[in-house]
Amino acid sequence: MISELNKKNKLNQNSNSLNVSYVRNINIIFGNYPYPDIIHNFILDIKNNLDIKMENYTNVKGNMTNWNYFLDKSKFINFITFLINKHQTTHFDIFGHFFEKKTIQNAWGNEIKKGDSLDYHKHPCLHGVLYLTKGCDLILPELNLKITPEPGDYYIFPSEILHGFDESKENFNRYSLIFNIVENNNAFEYSKKLRAVRSRSHT
């Protein structure tokens, strides 16, 4: 769920996106991935593939997989395909001809325990998060917004959006899958990788 930090401002919200004006007009795409069994499997993937070298090494002051763990996983590619099918009519600039125009640069999982935090930072590109569990809110201070995680909820953000959170006070772990989307400089290579993954999933 997405809500305001300061209730004095009014949100301009549509059924699956939200316009927020500050220095520039911001569009946040959101929805729910309604497959709890796949969400559960994503959690297991993260739990079983945490990279000890990444612990507290990045803006994530907690545990995470390596940056590219989910890139070639068929479950993740199916999720991206779901996003394309869901949003290409309303957000054609992003999802139209997606695999020809865009590349998923990184896709990783986070595990946030009590006392862990996320340093406030920005991504230089389009980026998204798929929440796999409930957990502490994601704070977007410049937009006066907070995002309360619910399993299956996803959000796609434009570049340069400051976000983070202070130490989690939850008594349970928070799991999420994060990905960066960049303009495609090598459509052929990514398409080749995608075909190879799909071919493996049918054998």
Predicted feature descriptions by range:
Residues V20-V23, V60, V129, V182, ...:
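Extended aliphatic helical segments
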Residues S15-Y22, N56, I104, W108, ...:
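Alpha-helical context
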Residues M1-E100:
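Non-heme Fe(II)/2-oxoglutarate
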Residues G96-S168, F172-Y190, L194:
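Catalytic core of non-heme Fe(II) oxygenases with the double-stranded beta-helix
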Residues V197-T203:
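Short, cationic low-complexity segments
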